[in-house]
Amino acid sequence: ARQVINSYNQTFVNTVRATGGNNAIRCLMVPTYAASCSSTTVSDFVLPTDTVANKLIVDIHSYSPYNFALNTSGTSSFTQSDISQLQWTLQEIYNSFGAKGIPVIIGEFGALNKNNINDRVLWGENYLRIAKSYNIRCIWWDNNAFDTSGENFRLLNRGTLTWQYPELLEAMMKGLNS
């Protein structure tokens, strides 16, 4: 399956480049298998060849640490151990891509609402502070879900145009600016 995604990525790059215009030179994002940042998936990833130098960006998803950020049955407390795990994960992403001159974007990240805003604030500040130290850009997965159990990652209330958790947003900005 991983080889199939590698093949799809190469076909995507070839197809977009062949259409001409701005597509001949624009940046393109290519995912690992399932956009996973697991070490096995990353080691099986093959960056497509491209006719334009330095215009490919690897896209991965990282809900880390898993038991805090994504596991509905996991912990709601963000601990020093979680900071260490987050540091390790982001360093591995950097070592696999950024250190080799390959841009990488975390195209999805977030932490479930488990009625633990203070812990999510601490997590958000640390996540973006550490990611910034490795020059990794992150995109919050805002799926507009709020009133459900499970993957409720809404930050922006699209109906009222207000932030659902302004303190989390402020903490992430603090992490970026530290």
PLM region spans:
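Short, surface-exposed linear patches
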Residues: 50-55, 78-84, 127-129, 162
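Substrate-binding cleft of secreted/luminal carbohydrate-active enzymes
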Residues: 86-177
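Acidic/histidine-rich helix-loop elements
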Residues: 67-86, 160
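Alpha-helix N-cap and loop-to-helix initiation/capping positions
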Residues: 1-7, 78-85, 118-119
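Active-site region of glycoside hydrolase catalytic domains
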Residues: 1-74, 91-112, 133-134
